[in-house]
Structures are given as structure tokens and as C-alpha cells.
From Swiss-Prot:
Record note on quaternary structure: The RNAP catalytic core consists of 2 alpha, 1 beta, 1 beta' and 1 omega subunit. When a sigma factor is associated with the core the holoenzyme is formed, which can initiate transcription.
Domain of life of the source: Bacteria
Keywords: DNA-directed RNA polymerase, Nucleotidyltransferase, Transcription, Transferase
Family: Belongs to the RNA polymerase beta chain family.
One GO term (biological process): DNA-templated transcription
Annotated region (Disordered), positions in chain: 1177-1199
Keyword Transcription annotated: yes
Taxonomic path: Bacteria, Bacillati, Bacillota, Bacilli, Lactobacillales
This protein's record includes keyword Ribonucleoprotein: no
Protein name: DNA-directed RNA polymerase subunit beta
PROSITE patterns attached to this UniProt entry: RNA_POL_BETA
Organism (species): Ligilactobacillus salivarius (strain UCC118)
Molecular-function GO terms, alphabetical: DNA binding; DNA-directed RNA polymerase activity; ribonucleoside binding
Length: 1199
């Protein structure tokens, strides 16, 4: 087969596609959910132990007792994953910690195993089961700890520099200059103090020492020293500075040098209070390291080998890349150009400070010699900041004014890191442990030291509570999107910049949300939500991974420096490493030996796209799809779509509903198999072997060593989104299977591939205006043949509780309900499985005791005779809500006797699952993969649809107007190639950025015997006449989305009212009304529709008495009475009175109108026996009239 026609690629064992890719894949996609699983594994293996080592040993205040950590272990989980789902429990394992209590007075050691609560475990699919629901912990993108330099122009055009030292936790340190060029420091966002005072406080008091240490005679430092004068001669300079700092940090408290020393030590030099984390130490050492800072500067001294005296760099020599390669090993040594400074006794830190200093010429003033000071590579074990870090960062800050060094871009992915599950959990666990530590200390001082045991000291409540809080209510712990496998996979690979310690939606500006050049190969530039979260929630690119520091890395093929050939050696680079290299694109043509075909290639260097000689190329992309996320990589011809529409396409694929008969796309991208395989919905074999038994519920595989693996399939489960989760076997008895092979398809899968929709026949044409504005006209065949039919399962729950008046009861005996309504209930009053139910039907019969009323004499007599008190109960049965009818698929009953854990006060709980078969109907939302969405506007009988010359009717008609302005031409290419694939009976793969070209599509059409322009004559099904022009007809993958009209349609009859305003509630869930808002009122006012407006604002809204009276009048056929005062007006009056205003309502004659309180109208509101009351009033009225009549007659007689 020639290259033009593509080549065959096998995906799994059941699907072969003709692939049009031209670029050889050198690296397989990684496991797509390893972001989750690897991080959690790290937490269990290392993170937990780290936490215990950090907090322990815990010593009491006198130092008599200490509690040490020995080891921990997780025991077997109480429930399996499936049982946890059914019991609404957590899938978790008990954590046991071995602790050792040492009594320093007696030398006695007690070891004990302490239970530390149940710890949620991650399932194989990378999710957690919390209270029976699957949840995902989304990774968080935060600013990395480290030292950052920034610059901004002031109003006079001067560049002001600023520096921020950000720890993982602890106080921030900021340096800045003011308009007069005086340098200041802020500690933890407090008021600023001259920068030199901080150095004095560290124990270097004199001006000369400061100039020597900072190695700078810059104007800014000199001005700062002038500003920082010795005010109180009784104190030394060090003590004075300490007191000044204390005054800023604790204003109003008596200041002493000692208290200031202990405060600063606690703020910056205590590892428990100040933590840079390994990543912060790594970033600070990297930024302050002389290797990067000396590049391209001219040295002002000769640098020689300290051992041999051999000259490495001559004075006045420029340090370029070659010189630096020679110098770098020396700079890494402890004895090369290092100087030690000893602080005075009065300083905060007593240890001497070692700095690495090299003299260079200032780039701004070549005569001026400036010191470049490094922190001498502080050891990685120092979690807190050191004086050397402070001094080196100040030196960098002053050197920026000399034109040395660079400022940082905070949106660069080298300065943002991810916190994945493991780290988020670890932080939460730390909070719990530190709360526990406080309790342990207190208990140590209270309890008898001779008899106390570790168990008595430990209170695990704070630990358990913090873990529970994290999984239950953290912003990053989310209810898993289980609409389809792609949604599930994308959710696990998501990054959020929101959440605790992150940004907030309102504060996030344009820059943070924007696509940055460092996103290339790390974060998808396409897949992000539309709306307020745009750019704050992102998706991991397909090949990216996260390194131990939390930075996102992407793979590149190394280019050999000697031969300039591309090797198969793969290096993973973080964003700041990548900045040093020139990287060629994946589609640069290569010869068979790996050398570049052309002498010049397109490449990237930082944020530039450059045409560059191949000799200067360091790396090459591994694949064209490494730029995008998995969902985006599922869009064929992505390169022909506008990015805004591609964004919609990527997002809408995640909302596709799993159909009854799914079909994989005829035109795929080749990633469908991998996406479905890794999503966790397919059944995957664990070992290789031979299939021995297959049915709908179980598959058995005989391993080569003779043992048997049994795999249970999930049948018709309800997924998180109420969709149907069902697995279907795709292997047969006798098949050989490999380890890690798909045995059974999950929802929205076919033959191991992702199958989110169908391949209907589509024409771009109009049809009587029915596809105006993105509407879709569909063939009735799609409804009749269940092409787009899906199953939805809803869960309904009823609890029988204990009430003050007695227990509720689940029963068939329901007051005032006819036998007909009970026909589908069993003897306990619970619906039968398989019964067909509609709105308002009883699912679970339940009665609740009513308050006992005073009995009449007759009733008391009856009770005395029959001995039984008439039970006063009301019907509180669970009924089918509006629009939720269907077939009862399952019923689960939970009781304490059955060993189920129920919440207090609940005696029994019944869950009913109702399955609905939803066919495609008018109002449903559909979409292609290119952001081409629309709603179904008309279902046309098959015989009326336009048909092709061979008589085949079209399935879907789309408006051609939806293509040009939206610039998603990919859908047209998808359509043509799909048509060719259908005719040829093949599946094709067109990978993103490396797919079928125009000529491939035309040759495929030719091969299939179709016209070269992909158009055909269509005939009108109603008249049989041909349409004037030929029409583009083809096969395009089309999805039905989760926004279905059945879930949205709603109408209120009689429903609930809001308590305070007495207005109807809003929304379908509350069975609410339609809001008639301010603007709608204007519309009626404009038309002068006074009476309509009046009834909308009174009877139909919150005139409580009026609406009852109106109801009575309608029932009796009498004229409707005048409206009363709306309740909201009464609320307004009450609010004003609450503010102390004496407000009265007067009529035209200045008489006060009595606003009766709601309590006075109680009977009316409740509407209890309103008709009886009304009848009684009528009778009284008639009686009065009759009396009056007789009285009048009497009067006339007497006259």
C-alpha cells in the first residue's frame, strides 16, 4: 500500500485502523492515570512516614517524657470497593502506629500499637470511595516556594525592583525600593523597615560590615545606610535593630532585644514554623547559584584552582558557556572563593555564615567592580531559610540595579508546581497531627508519668477529623464526573489553580489564565472550561508527567551533539530546563539514520519560534500530540479547527451520554483505545492465559500456571451522573489473552475503543428553516432503531425514623389511598422490581404518627368498647417525582438487623432505582467533535427525508451556515473521510497535527468510487424532485450530550412557598414557578395591562389571604375578590420597623390601614378546611340576612 493511502495499525486485538500518520511514534503514551496512582503510592510509602518524623518525638514542657514514632502499618480494608459502594461507606483501611514512650526520669520505655483511624484507600482506577460515592482529588497548581525577583516602572519611568522569598509555610520576606531609591524589607506583609536593619539584627552591626557582606557599594545601599541612623546610643546597633523589628512585628508590646531574638528565630530559623520544603530549597539554591549568575559577565579578578594554583579564568575574561563548563566544578566545591563571617553575640543567629563571592565588572558601568554573592549551596537538608540565603538574595536584588541577573515571570511553569493527591493529603495529615501534638503535650503534664501509656496520651480525633474534612468538603475533593470514560479520565488528569492556598476566581487576572509558552507539552492549551474558570482549570498534556518536586515535565528526543542526529534517547525536561535548549518540532523531516533532511528547521527557543540551523538543535519533540490533552487528542483534523471551537469540542466529548449500541468512530485519531483502556471503566486482564468461561456476569481466565482468575462484570449500575454503567464481554471461550488486555467493554466503548456516539449519514443543507441557528433536523429512524437511545438510572430514597410522637412505619396500610395505587407494592409496602411507574406513584408506603387530638365522647366510648385507640397517622410515602417515571430496576433495603450502619434515629432505609430508556427527542442537545453543537428541532419521518440517488435517506441535516463563521473546517474533512471509510468498510485514524491531508481524503474518496468533491445529488423525500445544487453528504461522528430536555422541562401546578416572603420557590428541583422579574413588569406597564400586572403581583405571588379566597371563588364560580396586601410589603414594613422607624400605612383619608400579622391569618394560610369555613361563613351571613329581613318586616308592620 503506498504511503498516500496510509498504513494499517492494530489497536488492541479487535480493531484495525488505516492510519494516515507520517511520523514514527518513538514513545508510547504513559499510563494516563499515573498522576493519581503514583502520587498516592508515594504518600503511603514515604509521605506518611515523613509526617510522623516531622512531628515526633513529642516532649513535655519539663522534658520528663518523650513520645517517639517507631513504625506504622495499614491493615486489611473493612469493605471491598463494591461493598463500600453498597453500604454508603468509605473504602478505607485501619491505620495502626507503633509508638514508644520514654520516661527520662526512670529510663522506662513503653511501646504500644495505637489505632489512628481509618484511612481512605485509592482504588485501582485512581479514585476514592467516600460515603459510597466515587470522588477524585484534583491536583492543584500553586506558586512554587523560592525566591522571586520582579520589576515595575513607576510614574517617573524609573524601574523599581522587588524581591519576595516565599516559603512552603511560614513568613514571607520582601525587599523593595522606594521613590528615593532607599531599600526596605517587609517581614510577613507588615510595615517596612530599612533593609540594613535586618542584616544588623542577624549580628552584623557596623556599616562597614554591611558593605563588606553585601559586597555592594550601589547608590541604593548607601542611601539606605544614610536613612538607617543610630538613634539610641544606649543600645548597640544590633540591639537597636532587633527592637525596631520587634516594634514592627508586635506593635504596642514592650520591646526587648531578647524577645525580638526569640521572635525572629521562631519566624525564620525554626524548622517547625518555617518550611521551604525540598522544592523551595532546590529553587533558592538554583536561583542564587553562581553558575547561572556569572554567565556572560566579565570577571574582575583571576580565578585559580585552590589546590594547584592553576589559573581557570583570567581577569577581564568574559565567562561564556565554554568557560563556565570549566569553572562549574570549582563553583560546586566548598573551598572555592568562600568567605566566612562571624556575627556578634547579640545577633539572632550565632553560627558563622559562609558565602561564595566572585568579583565582576558591572554591565552598566564597566569601571565599577561588583561582588556576586552566592549562598554557597546550602545543604538540601536545611528546610528553613539561612542568613546566607538572605544575604545572597539581597545581593541579587542590588545587582539587578547594575543590570545583572533576571526578573522572574510568575506564570512560567518553572515557577508553578503541582500538588497532587499525595501532597495534599500529607498537608492535611500534618494539620491533624499538629493539633494532636498539642493535646499530647497537655496530657503529658496532667497525667501520672509512672503509669501513663502512649494510648492514654494520644487523641486521634483531630487527625480523623482533618482527613474526613479533606475528603468530604475540600474544594479539591470532587464528585467524579462519570458521564462517560473520557470524562472520568479527564477529571483525574485535571489541574486547578483554585482551592486552599491557591487563587480565587475574582482575584485571578488575565495573565494567570492565559496560555503560556511553557505550557507546550505540559498543559493543554485547548481543554479548559468556558466561563469564570477559564484558564484556572487545565488538563495535563498527553505525554506529560510530574517530577518529585511537583514540576510538570515533558519528554524530548535527544539530538547528539557530535553527529547532529536525532537519537531514541528520551529526556524529560521541566519548563526552566527547557529554556536553555533549542527544540525542533516533531514533524521535522528525518532520514532513516536520524539525521535531519533539511539544513534549517523550525524550532523553539524559550518563547520564540525560530528557523535555525540543524547543528544548533538540542532536542526534538517526541510526538505532534504531546502538546494537547487526551480529550483534545480525540478530535480528528484538530489542525483545521479554530481553537475556540476545539475547546468546545474537547469539553463536549466529556458530556456525551453512553448509548445502548455504541459504535467507535469511523474516523478516529488512534488514541481511542488507550483512552478507554486507562479510564478504568473497561475490564482489564491481570495475567495472560486462556479464556475458559464467559457470560454476561463473569469471565474466567485459566493462567498458564494452572490457576484461575475470575473477573466479575458490572451490570446496569448507576454511575455518579445517573448514567447506566454496564460492562459487556468482548472475548470468547478459547481466546488467548495477554496481561493488560481488554476483556470487556465498559459504557461508551466498542471493541476496546472509546465509542461516545454514532456514525450517522449527515448532509449540510437547510430544510424548511428547521435547522436555523444551529438547530438539527433528524430522521425518525434514529428514534425507531434506538440509534441514540440511552438508559438513565435514578435513585430514590426513603428513611423510617423515630419521631417525638413515635416511630415512622414502612407499610402497605396508608390512609386515604385506594387499592389501585397499591397494586405494585409488596406486603411490606415496597415497590416490586420490574414494575412500571409514572409520576406520583407510590414507591415506598410510609406513615408518620400525628399529634394526638382531644377525643370526643363518642370516640372515647368506642375505644372503651374496642380497646384500640384510632391511630392518627399521616401519609409520608415516597412517590415518583415529576418526570422521573420508568421501570423499577432494583430495590435495596437497609436495616440494623441486617448489619447495615444507619445514621442515628433511622430504623430502616429503602433505596429504589428507576431505569428510564430515553430516546432522542426534540430539545435534546447533540454535537460533533469540532464544537459544532445544536439542539434537535424536528423529527422527520423516514419517507420525508432527502435521499441519495441509491435511495438511502439522510440521518441528520445540519445548517451549512454553522461552518464558515466558526472556522471549524475539521468537521467537513471529517465528513468526507468518514464517507470514504463507510464505503470502503474500514476504520481510519487521523492523529492530531499528523493526520490525513487533503490529497489523502480525495484519494480515499476516489478509491471508494465517490465524486472528488464529496458532494452528491439529493432528492426531496416529499416531492421526489432533485434539489437544485449538489450537497455535501458524508459520515460524521455525532454525539448525544447529557443536556437532555427530559431533565429540563418543568411546569408548576400547586407547589411550595418561601417561608418569609411567601412567594413561590424557583427551579425544577423545588417544583418552583417562573420568576416574573423587574423587566417583565416593565413590559406589562408599557402596555398598560394594569389588571394582569395586579394579579401577577398579588394572587399569583404573595398575597396570602387573597390566593386562598381566589381559590374558593373559582371553585364556587363567584367573582374573584379584591386583592389584599402582598406579604413582601409586610416584610418591608417589618424590616423598617426593625431599624427603629415607626412606619404606618395610611389610606387616602389619612386613616391608618391595619396590617394584620400572618399569625392572625393562620387559618387562611394553612388552607385547612377553607371551604367548610367558607360555607359556615355563608350560612352565618344568610342567617344574619334572614334576621335583618324579619326585623325589617317587623318594623314595617309596626309602622
Amino acid at each position: 500500500m503506498n504511503n498516500l493511502a496510509g498504513h494499517l495499525v492494530k489497536y488492541g486485538k479487535h480493531r484495525v485502523r488505516r492510519s494516515y500518520s507520517r511520523i514514527k511514534e518513538v514513545l508510547d503514551l504513559p499510563n494516563l492515570i499515573e498522576v493519581q496512582t503514583d502520587s498516592y503510592k508515594w504518600f503511603l510509602d514515604e509521605g506518611l512516614r515523613e509526617m510522623f518524623d516531622d512531628i515526633m518525638p513529642i516532649e513535655d514542657f519539663q522534658g520528663k517524657l518523650s513520645l517517639e514514632f517507631v513504625d506504622y502499618q495499614l491493615l486489611e480494608p473493612k469493605y471491598t470497593v463494591e461493598e463500600a459502594r453498597q453500604h454508603d461507606a468509605n473504602y478505607s483501611a485501619p491505620l495502626h502506629v507503633t509508638l514508644r514512650l520514654i520516661n527520662h526520669e526512670t529510663g522506662e520505655i513503653k511501646s504500644q500499637d495505637v489505632f489512628f483511624g481509618d484511612f481512605p484507600l485509592m482504588t485501582k482506577q485512581g479514585t476514592f470511595i467516600i460515603n459510597g460515592a466515587e470522588r477524585v482529588i484534583v491536583s492543584q497548581l500553586v506558586r512554587s516556594p523560592g525566591v522571586y525577583f520582579n520589576s515595575e516602572l513607576d510614574k517617573n519611568g524609573r524601574t523599581n525592583y522587588g524581591t519576595t522569598v516565599i516559603p512552603n509555610r511560614g513568613a514571607w520576606l520582601e525587599y523593595e525600593t522606594d521613590a528615593k531609591n532607599v531599600a526596605y524589607v517587609r517581614i510577613d506583609r507588615t510595615r517596612k523597615i530599612p533593609l540594613t536593619e535586618l542584616i544588623r539584627a542577624l549580628g552584623y552591626g557596623s556599616d562597614n560590615e554591611i558593605v563588606e557582606i553585601l559586597g555592594s557599594n550601589s547608590d541604593s545601599l548607601m542611601l539606605t545606610l544614610e536613612k538607617d541612623v543610630h538613634k539610641n546610643m544606649d543600645d548597640s546597633r544590633v540591639e537597636e535593630s532587633l527592637k525596631d523589628i520587634y516594634e514592627r512585628l508586635r506593635p504596642g508590646e514592650p520591646k526587648t532585644a531578647d524577645s525580638s531574638r526569640s521572635l525572629l528565630t521562631a519566624r525564620f530559623f525554626d524548622p517547625k514554623r518555617y518550611d521551604l520544603a525540598p522544592v523551595g530549597r532546590y529553587k533558592i539554591n538554583k536561583k542564587l547559584d553562581l553558575k547561572t549568575r556569572l554567565l556572560n559577565l566579565t570577571v574582575a579578578e583571576t580565578l585559580a584552582d585552590p589546590d594547584t594554583g592553576e589559573i581557570i579564568v583570567n581577569k577581564d575574561e568574559v565567562i561564556d558557556k565554554q568557560v563556565m563548563d570549566k569553572l562549574a566544578p570549582y563553583l560546586a566545591r566548598d573551598d572555592f572563593k568562600t568567605f566566612t563571617f562571624h556575627p556578634s553575640e547579640e545577633g539572632v543567629v550565632q553560627e558563622p555564615m559562609t558565602l561564595q563571592i566572585v568579583k565582576v565588572y558591572s554591565p552598566k558601568d564597566p569601571e565599577k567592580v561588583v561582588n556576586v554573592i552566592g549562598n554557597a549551596n546550602v545543604d538540601i537538608q536545611f528546610k528553613h531559610i539561612t542568613p546566607a540565603d538572605i544575604v545572597a538574595s539581597m545581593n541579587y536584588f542590588f545587582n539587578l540595579q547594575e543590570g545583572m541577573g533576571s526578573t522572574d515571570d510568575i506564570d512560567h511553569l518553572g515557577n508553578r508546581r503541582t500538588r497532587s493527591v499525595g501532597e495534599l493529603l500529607q498537608n492535611q495529615f500534618r494539620i491533624g497531627l499538629s493539633r494532636m501534638e498539642r493535646v499530647v503535650r497537655e496530657r503529658m503534664s496532667i497525667q501520672d508519668t509512672s503509669t501513663v501509656t502512649p494510648q492514654q496520651l494520644i487523641n486521634i480525633r483531630p487527625v480523623v477529623a482533618s482527613i474526613k474534612e479533606f475528603f468530604g468538603s475540600s474544594q479539591l475533593s470532587q464528585f467524579m464526573d462519570q458521564t462517560n470514560p473520557l470524562g472520568e479520565l479527564s477529571h483525574k488528569r485535571r489541574f486547578s489553580a483554585l482551592g486552599p492556598g491557591g487563587l480565587t476566581r475574582d482575584r485571578a487576572g488575565y495573565e494567570v489564565r492565559d496560555v503560556h509558552y511553557t505550557h507546550y507539552g505540559r498543559m493543554c492549551p485547548i481543554e479548559t472550561p468556558e466561563g469564570p474558570n477559564i484558564g484556572l482549570i487545565n488538563s495535563l498534556s498527553s505525554y506529560a508527567r510530574i517530577n518529585k518536586y511537583g514540576f510538570v515535565e515533558t519528554p524530548y528526543r535527544r539530538v547528539s551533539w557530535e553527529t547532529h542526529k536525532v537519537t531514541d534517547k528520551i529526556d524529560y525536561l521541566t519548563a526552566d530546563e527547557e529554556d536553555n535548549y533549542v527544540i525542533a518540532q516533531a514533524n521535522s523531516p528525518l532520514n532513516d539514520d536520524g539525521s535531519f533532511v533539511d539544513d534549517v528547521v523550525m524550532a523553539r527557543k524559550k518563547d520564540d519560534d525560530v528557523e535555525i540551523s540543524t547543528e544548533k538543535v538540542d532536542y526534538m519533540d517526541v510526538s505532534p500530540k504531546q502538546v494537547v490533552a487526551v480529550a483534545t487528542a480525540c478530535i480528528p483534523f484538530l489542525e483545521n479547527d479554530d481553537s475556540n471551537r476545539a475547546l468546545m469540542g474537547a469539553n463536549m466529548q466529556r458530556q456525551a451520554v453512553p448509548l445502548i449500541k455504541p459504535h467507535a468512530p469511523l474516523v478516529g485519531t488512534g488514541i481511542e483505545y488507550k483512552a478507554a483502556h486507562d479510564s478504568g471503566v473497561a475490564l482489564i486482564s491481570e495475567h495472560e492465559g486462556t479464556v475458559e468461561y464467559v457470560d454476561a456476569r463473569e469471565i474466567r481466565v485459566r493462567r498458564d500456571d494452572g490457576s484461575l482468575d475470575k473477573y466479575k462484570l458490572m451490570k446496569f449500575h448507576r454511575s455518579n451522573g445517573g448514567k447506566n454503567y454496564n460492562q459487556t464481554p468482548i472475548v470468547r471461550v478459547g481466546d488467548r489473552v495477554d496481561a493488560d488486555e481488554v476483556l470487556a467493554d465498559g459504557p461508551a466503548m466498542e471493541n476496546g475503543e472509546l465509542a461516545l456516539g454514532q456514525n450517522p449519514l449527515i448532509a449540510f443543507m437547510t430544510w424548511d428553516g428547521y435547522n436555523f441557528e444551529d438547530a438539527i433536523a433528524i430522521n425518525e429512524r434514529l428514534v425507531k432503531e434506538d440509534v441514540y437511545t440511552s438508559i438513565h438510572i435514578e435513585e430514590h430514597e426513603s428513611e423510617a425514623r423515630d419521631t417525638k410522637l413515635g416511630p415512622e412505619e414502612i407499610t402497605r396500610e396508608i390512609p386515604n389511598v385506594g387499592e389501585d395505587a397499591l397494586k405494585n407494592l409488596d406486603e411490606f409496602g415496597i415497590i416490586r422490581i420490574g414494575a412500571e411507574v409514572k409520576d406520583g406513584d407510590i414507591l415506598v408506603g410510609k406513615v408518620t404518627p400525628k399529634g394526638v387530638t382531644e377525643l370526643s365522647a363518642e370516640e372515647r366510648l368506642l375505644h372503651a368498647i374496642f380497646g384500640e385507640k384510632a391511630r392518627e397517622v399521616r401519609d409520608t410515602s415516597l412517590r415518583v417525582p415529576h418526570g422521573a417515571g420508568g421501570i423499577v430496576q432494583d430495590v435495596k433495603i437497609f436495616t440494623r438487623e441486617g448489619g447495615d450502619e444507619l445514621s442515628p434515629g433511622v430504623n430502616m432505609m429503602v433505596r429504589v432505582y428507576i431505569a428510564q430508556k430515553r430516546k432522542l427527542q426534540v430539545g435534546d442537545k447533540m454535537a460533533g467533535r469540532h464544537g459544532n453543537k445544536g439542539t434537535v428541532s424536528v423529527v422527520i419521518p423516514e419517507e420525508d427525508m432527502p435521499f441519495m440517488p441509491d435511495g438511502t435517506p439522510i440521518d441528520i441535516m445540519l445548517s451549512p451556515m454553522g461552518v464558515p463563521s466558526r472556522m471549524n473546517i475539521g468537521q467537513v474533512l471529517d465528513l468526507h473521510l468518514g464517507m470514504a471509510a463507510r464505503k470502503l468498510g474500514i476504520h481510519v485514524a487521523s492523529p492530531v497535527f499528523d493526520g490525513a491531508r487533503d490529497e489523502d481524503i480525495w484519494s480515499a474518496l476516489q478509491e471508494a468510487g465517490l465524486p472528488g468533491d464529496g458532494k452528491t445529488v439529493l432528492y426531496d423525500g416529499r416531492t421526489g424532485e432533485a434539489f437544485d445544487n449538489r450537497i455535501a453528504v458524508g459520515v460524521m461522528y455525532y454525539l448525544k450530550l447529557a443536556h437532555m430536555v427530559d431533565d429540563k422541562i418543568h411546569a408548576r401546578s400547586i407547589g411550595p412557598y418561601s417561608l418569609v416572603t411567601q412567594q413561590p420557590l424557583g427551579g425544577k428541583a423545588q417544583f418552583g414557578g417562573q420568576r416574573f422579574g423587574e423587566m417583565e413588569v416593565w413590559a406589562l406597564e408599557a402596555y398598560g395591562a394594569a389588571y394582569t400586572l395586579q394579579e401577577i403581583l398579588t394572587y399569583k405571588s404573595d398575597d396570602v389571604v387573597g390566593r386562598v379566597k381566589t381559590y374558593e371563588a373559582i371553585v364556587k364560580g363567584e367573582p374573584i375578590p379584591k386583592p389584599g396586601v402582598p406579604e413582601s410589603f409586610r416584610v418591608l414594613v417589618k424590616e423598617l420597623q426593625a431599624l427603629g422607624m415607626d412606619m404606618k400605612v395610611l389610606d387616602a383619608d389619612k386613616n391608618e390601614i391595619e396590617l394584620r400579622d400572618m399569625d392572625d391569618e393562620d387559618d387562611d394560610i394553612v388552607n385547612v378546611d377553607a371551604l367548610k369555613k367558607f360555607a359556615k361563613e355563608q350560612e352565618e351571613k344568610k342567617a344574619k340576612e334572614a334576621e335583618q329581613e324579619t326585623a325589617e318586616k317587623e318594623e314595617t308592620k309596626t309602622e
